Design a protein with these regions (language model features):
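Membrane-interface helix termini and inter-helical loops of multi-pass transporters
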Residues: 174-181
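Helix-coil boundary and N-terminal low-complexity module in membrane systems
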Residues: 1-173, 185, 202-204, 209-239, ...
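Alpha-helical transmembrane segments of multi-pass membrane proteins
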Residues: 187-196
């Protein structure tokens, strides 16, 4: 049987340090590229939605609830106090304008993305876990094996995940457009920003926990939140790595576009999603192993209690 990539190297020190990350990344790069090409099927609706929002026609719309009544009062009684108050409530936000056909297409793309979101994440999480652990990995078959094994839970987890991301992104855009208008809006913007960071880190663990253990969705979310603290060192390094990856790609695109070269705009489509997933898996799985696998690997260790919630853990491997 031919293996899709190499397994564990004998006598190799696989301690998940920063130097070993680059060594393993280089070793698994070809497999990550193949995985990324599969993930592009999921990325196409996202790219279309982002492009339509950024490039489509927008109309400036006032977002403050007091704007309309204050505007009416200012027309009837244009006194200085009302005019000054109206100025503070005149923050505008660009609202996209869609034709009926375009709106139907976007809704269909959004529904398709929401339905398949959890399945793609479950499949990629399983493959990335295998690449990190040095298991023999068959990209195509392992990807769909994970989806089949977690079909129902991945579907509902994906819907919940997609809804949370959609709410956080829309809230972030909304309150970002209103920063500086009032103290309350500034506080809400900072809160949404902080919650978004926490949720991004939770996503490092959510699908890894789902494919590895037999846990309820609520326990997965709870443990993922706990791991944002327990693995804070690795989580921060992973966030820095993701930020550097995005910034470096953006810099290269801008640099080459300035001289008329468009290739850097296409190259990230071949690797960036899988590499980002590899970074998060490299950060998250050692934390999961430390707290949920290693303590119970020895048969002599007492059975876990309800307090640790590990009594409900059953390895899916």
């Amino acid at each position: 049987m031919n293996r899709d990539g190499k397994g564990v190297y004998k006598e190799e020190n696989r301690k998940p340090t920063l130097p070993f990350f680059f060594k393993l990344l280089w070793r698994k790069l070809s497999q990550l590229i193949r995985l990324n090409l599969m993930l592009m099927v999921q990325a196409i609706p996202i790219l279309v939605l982002v492009y339509v929002y950024l490039a489509g026609y927008k109309t400036a719309t006032a977002t403050e609830m007091l704007y309309a009544p204050l505007y009416g009062i200012s027309k009837i009684a244009p006194v200085g106090g009302i005019t000054a108050l109206l100025d503070t409530q005149s923050i505008q936000m660009g609202i996209p304008i869609f034709t009926p056909v375009m709106l139907i297409v976007l809704i269909c793309l959004g529904v398709l993305l929401a339905i398949t979101f959890g399945w793609f994440n479950a499949g990629s999480a399983y493959v990335l876990r295998g690449l990190f652990r040095g298991d023999p990995v068959f990209i195509w078959s392992d990807f769909f094996y994970a989806i089949k094994r977690n079909l129902k839970q991945a579907f509902f987890m994906g819907l919940l995940d997609f809804a949370c991301i959609a709410v956080l992104v829309s809230d972030f855009i909304f309150f970002y457009s209103r920063t500086g208008s009032s103290y309350g809006n500034d506080v809400m913007y900072l809160m949404i920003f902080a919650i978004s960071i926490v949720y991004v880190i939770m996503r490092f663990y959510m699908y890894q926990l789902m494919i590895t253990f037999d846990l309820s969705t609520m326990k997965i979310l709870k443990n993922s939140l706990i791991f944002t603290i327990l693995g804070i060192k690795r989580n921060v390094l992973a966030m820095i790595g993701l930020l550097l990856l995005i910034v470096l790609n953006a810099v290269f695109i801008v640099m080459f576009l300035s001289v008329g070269i468009t290739i850097p705009m296409v190259l990230p489509l071949f690797y960036i999603m899988a590499v980002m997933g590899f970074i998060t898996t490299y950060a998250a799985y050692p934390v999961i192993d430390k707290y949920m696998i290693a303590p119970y690997a020895n048969d002599n260790v007492p059975e876990p209690t309800e307090e640790t919630e590990a009594s409900e853990i059953s390895d899916k491997e």
